[in-house]
Amino acid sequence: MTNTEKYKQLRSMIPEMRRIKHIHFVGIGGAGMGGIAEVLVNEGYHISGSDIATNSVTDRLISLGAKVIIGHHADSVEHADVVVVSTAINHENPEIIAAKERRIPIVRRAEMLAELMRYRHGVAIAGTHGKTTTTSLIASVYAQAQRDPTFVIGGLLNSAGTNARLGTSRYLIAEADESDASFLHLQPMVSVITNIEADHMDTYGGDFEKLKTTFVDFLHNLPFYGVAVMCIDDEINREIMPRVGRQIVTYGFSQDADVQALNFNQIGHQSQFVVRRKDKEDLALVLNLPGEHNVLNALAAIAVASEDDIDDESIVKALAEFEGIGRRFQHLGEFNTANGQVMLVDDYGHHPSEVLATIKAARAGWPDKRLVMAYQPHRYSRTRDLYDDFVEVLSQVDCLLLLDVYSAGEAAIPGADGRALCRSIRLRGQIDPIFVASPDQLASVLPDVLQAGDLLLTQGAGNIGALSKLLASTNLGFE
């Protein structure tokens, strides 16, 4: 009997869990929601869900036997035993209202993830940036070591063709979402914090101290024999470490890191470095991802794997053969246009620090290329809160095509839109950005902008990802 079968049997022995047969997801098309739904459908639960449109996540779930309903309707929850809700769903959603009227339990995504983690050895990855890549790297190392983990990732793991998988071992590797503080529901055995910056501040009442305390509380959900893995290069991580009453393993480029990277060198898409660990020989590695920020993500994976006595051969092979994640510096191809050959890369980063890391990786790997960025800001509140940082970072490309803000359901905020950002960047004087009023217009603008040898980077967390794939299918608008 596999561990997965044991967990199913154990749940069936709990009287309370025997009542749960039908689980309904409101917002099932999101990567995090869809990932949990995929694990549960493979565990034998009847899964249904709703969303406003189909996508690759819903298509996969349908192929696995889940029922997906387009649109939100009160009768969709009629036979559900529990309703799982995405943080993006408004409380006025008809399915939420109907579930309350029927007294059907409503839980957040993280609560259901915590239930999956209850009987497993959980590894939870938190932090403002790098969660998806770090989670993917850890899952890949464990898979290479034949540990066959269950994983739930916020992006598409290319090697698996999915963002979630039900494994047969006791391991569950998952992202921990701090955006709504719901990661406090999790009780893992190992917790990773990549970094801490001011983001999602509405959740924390605009109080950065409250955000930091919440991360400390997250680490204190570890058992006393658990391990906190923290990037010591991050200033806030270093600041909160004295408050953490658990064993800590640090990683970074810093000399005092327990797992330290040395001799970093980037050649195109690959990063080369040496890792130094206590009581182990130095290990030369090639990571099939660009940029120092991705080396930090890899160090987290190395730290977690080393604590679990995974062999170095598996670590080396997993990092060298890593096939990447969807929309994380994703190389979409080289295109022969009327203006010459252009390289297209798509990236999800939408915080100034993430955008800067992507720019640095592009500069380091392709120093001779002109960097053209098509950037779509994500959320008016983030644009407002980090406005000056966006102006500074976006000024560092050679040519900027700036789209309007992808609202993600927020109301517009005066002075925090794409036009205002464009004006401020122009006033800074380093570059003369081009405002693109509608995503549909980007393809018509590109032929007048692109030059031979350019690297075109589509950047942002909104629908620019779908737009980049459309550009790839139409030869960057030259057809």
Curated annotation (Swiss-Prot):
EC number: 6.3.2.8
Catalysed reactions, semicolon-separated: UDP-N-acetyl-alpha-D-muramate + L-alanine + ATP = UDP-N-acetyl-alpha-D-muramoyl-L-alanine + ADP + phosphate + H(+)
Keyword terms: ATP-binding, Cell cycle, Cell division, Cell shape, Cell wall biogenesis/degradation, Cytoplasm, Ligase, Nucleotide-binding, Peptidoglycan synthesis
Bridged cysteine pairs (disulfide): none
A single cellular component GO annotation: cytoplasm
Enzyme class of the recorded protein, top EC level: ligase
Protein location: Cytoplasm
GO annotation, biological process: cell division; cell wall organization; peptidoglycan biosynthetic process; regulation of cell shape
InterPro entries in alphabetical order: Mur-like_cat_sf, Mur_ligase_C, Mur_ligase_C_dom_sf, Mur_ligase_cen, Mur_ligase_N, MurCDEF_pg_biosynth, UDP-N-AcMur_Ala_ligase_MurC
Any Pfam family hit: Mur_ligase
Domain of life, source organism: Bacteria
Known pathway: Cell wall biogenesis; peptidoglycan biosynthesis
Keyword Secreted: no
Residues annotated for ATP binding in this entry: 127-133
GO MF annotations, alphabetized: ATP binding; UDP-N-acetylmuramate-L-alanine ligase activity
Protein family: Belongs to the MurCDEF family.
Reported function: Cell wall formation.
Name this protein carries in UniProt: UDP-N-acetylmuramate--L-alanine ligase
Species of provenance: Shewanella denitrificans (strain OS217 / ATCC BAA-1090 / DSM 15013)
